[in-house]
From Swiss-Prot:
Keywords for the protein's UniProt record, in alphabetical order: Cytoplasm, Heme biosynthesis, Iron, Lyase, Metal-binding, Porphyrin biosynthesis
CDD domains: Ferrochelatase_C, Ferrochelatase_N
Location (main, coarse): cytoplasm
Reactions it catalyzes: Fe-coproporphyrin III + 2 H(+) = coproporphyrin III + Fe(2+)
Protein name: Coproporphyrin III ferrochelatase
A Pfam match: Ferrochelatase
Length: 369
């Protein structure tokens, strides 16, 4: 691991919530998608196809509002601990752009920043691309002849006890909506399925270092296993599947897809599914469109009952976890992890956490948020 700064908690001037971004009105949709796909030669027709998903919801991605809710919760947790650390919000692809947020932080006198990237996972898209955002942000400040920021990015949190406990809680609540009171006694017609964003197989193979194996999918399987263990779900009564693949179909992505999986389960006699979007901390467009719209429509056609578990980013426990990740990165708290798969991503000033970790590969884009 590359060296990290030896800060104390009093050295942290601010926390930055760094995210993907999303449109907040019909007029934002195409400009946002153009930002997401800049330099990739994506035809306008394809952007219009994706835009339909946003326009169905008034051109609004739920992501920005949910991130603001996370920020409000972080501020409350900090206040409850007597900490007066400001929390800022910056996006890669839409307002508030992280470069603009960086300028504001500098004007406010901020120098040392703890950066929380809104992804639990390793891989290029889930981790290293946020390092690149930090590098570009400081280059922007240099071009503006402003002081650069010292940025400590927090680690991946897929196996943090508070994340696993909160995921377990929402899965249990979703099961109760189907009348299931004991997840350790699921019947043959009942299953729990955990979903995460599909990525190209080559991107999965290049997540982490070579010796880590495919880090992204290993982390997703580990997190699902930890939740299942917490709830007493037997290995035969839960699965991990993927969703929201994009591209032209010529490049293999992680499978099975949630829609194909639901059809197969129906054919095997399963009529009730508890669906837990463990790969998403908030109700991204992938969740509200792909699960609440497409999957529910399919389930209705098949006569299946689907109960979708809530995402956990809006909870007080999630905000507490973020503050604990800050404390952990400074040595104030011990490293808290329940699993054995590596949890990486803690880095300084955009340098990768390890040499040759999560190297980028050319891949189709996902334009949703």
């Amino acid at each position: 691991m590359l060296p990290l700064p030896t800060w104390t908690l009093s050295d942290v001037d601010a926390i930055l919530v760094l995210s993907f971004g999303g449109p907040e009105g019909q007029q934002d949709v195409i400009p946002f998608l153009e930002n997401v796909t800049r330099g990739r030669g994506i035809p306008r027709e394809r952007l219009e196809e994706v835009a339909v998903h946003y326009r169905h919801f008034g051109g609004i991605s739920p992501l920005n509002a949910l991130n603001r809710e996370i920020i409000g919760n972080i501020i409350e947790v900090l206040s409850s601990r007597g900490l007066e650390i400001p929390v800022y919000f910056g996006n890669r692809n839409w307002h508030p752009f992280v470069n603009d947020t960086a300028e504001k932080m500098v004007r406010d006198g901020v120098r040392n920043v703890a950066v929380f990237a809104t992804s639990a996972w390793g891989g290029y898209s889930g981790c290293r691309q946020y390092d690149e955002d930090i590098v570009r942000m400081n280059h922007h400040l240099e071009e503006k002849e402003l002081p650069t920021l010292n940025c400590l990015k927090l680690r991946q949190f897929f196996d943090h006890p508070l994340f696993i406990e909160e995921m377990s809680s929402v899965v249990f609540q979703a099961a109760r909506e189907l009348g299931i009171s004991a997840l350790d006694e699921l019947q043959l017609h009942q299953k729990v399925v955990f979903t995460a964003h599909s990525i190209p197989e080559v991107a999965n193979e290049n997540s982490g270092r070579k010796e880590d194996g495919p880090l992204y999918s290993r982390q997703v399987y580990e997190a699902a296993s930890l939740v299942a263990k917490h709830l007493g779900i037997s290995q035969e009564r839960y699965d991990v599947v993927w969703q929201s693949a994009s591209g032209n179909g010529q490049i293999p992505w992680l499978e099975p897809d949630i829609l194909d999986y639901a059809k197969c389960q129906h054919d095997e006699g399963v009529s009730e599914l508890v669906v837990a979007p463990i790969g998403f901390i908030s109700d991204h467009m992938e969740v509200v469109w792909d699960l609440d719209h497409e999957l529910q429509d399919l389930a209705s056609d098949l006569g299946m009952s689907i109960s979708r578990a809530a995402t956990v980013g809006h909870t007080d426990s999630f905000a507490t976890m973020i503050v604990e990740l800050v404390e952990e990165s400074l040595g104030v708290k011990p490293h808290q992890n329940l699993g054995t798969v590596p949890s990486k991503g803690c880095s300084f000033n955009g340098e990768p956490c390890e040499v040759n970790c999560c190297k980028p590969v050319q891949r189709p884009h996902s334009a949703k948020a």
